[in-house]
Swiss-Prot record:
InterPro entries: Ribosomal_uL22, Ribosomal_uL22_CS, Ribosomal_uL22_euk/arc, Ribosomal_uL22_sf. GO terms for molecular function: structural constituent of ribosome. Belongs to the universal ribosomal protein uL22 family. Keywords: Ribonucleoprotein, Ribosomal protein. This is Large ribosomal subunit protein uL22. SUPFAM superfamilies: Ribosomal protein L22 (SSF54843). It comes from Yarrowia lipolytica (strain CLIB 122 / E 150). One of its GO terms (biological process) is cytoplasmic translation. Pfam families: Ribosomal_L22 (PF00237). One of its GO terms (cellular component) is cytosolic large ribosomal subunit. It comes from the Eukaryota.
């Protein structure tokens, strides 16, 4: 069994998937993961489909150097956004894998939430390119490791009403008693 950077609280209510040494840009995949972290699974898959069709965009926050601006970033409060199709394809495949794992465990796919998604850098794949005057430059790719965990949200328990009052001084107690006598 592979290790994840986060231990799930209740393994019976979570499903996970991971991909290692995926040949897709680390920076683009990092931004895609950040855009859907904490989202409902169905909502995230629909959003990624819309980004693939260029109807919405992925906001670029950290790795945003030399990136053009687009109005589609306004919904996220940013000006720099892109449509990284290859990274989206890898993330969609992992989400569908985790969804299949969740269905195998008997979890409800309508309520699943992306509770953890993390992108790490994999070792660079090195090639070379030949330049003028006999020089050679490095020509590297930046692959990624991706891991994600889907979980059913915890049921919210209603907070019990407070039965005891805060500390009351003797003067306040006397005043409350006097008001009760007057109203009775």
């Amino acid at each position: 069994m592979t290790r994840y950077s986060v231990q799930s609280v209740d393994p019976t209510k979570t499903a996970s998937a991971r991909g290692a040494y995926l040949r897709t840009s680390f920076k683009n995949t990092y931004e895609v993961a950040g855009a859907i972290r904490g989202w409902n699974l169905q909502k995230a898959l629909a959003y990624l489909d819309q980004v693939t069709d260029h109807k919405r965009a992925i906001p670029f926050r950290k790795h945003a150097g030399s990136i053009g601006r687009t109005g589609q970033g306004k919904e996220f409060g940013v000006t720099k956004a892109r449509w990284p199709v290859k990274s989206i394809k890898f993330v969609q495949d992992l989400l569908q894998n985790a969804q299949a794992n969740a269905e195998t465990k008997g979890l409800d796919k309508e309520t699943l939430v992306i509770s953890h998604i993390q992108v790490n850098q994999a070792p660079k794949q090195r090639r070379r390119t030949y330049r003028a005057h006999g020089r050679i430059n490095a020509y590297q790719s930046s692959p990624s490791h991706i891991e994600l965990i889907l979980s059913e949200p915890a049921e919210e328990i209603a907070k019990a009403k407070e039965t005891s009052l805060a500390h009351i001084s003797s003067r306040q107690r006397g005043r409350i008693a006097a008001q009760k006598r007057i109203s009775a």
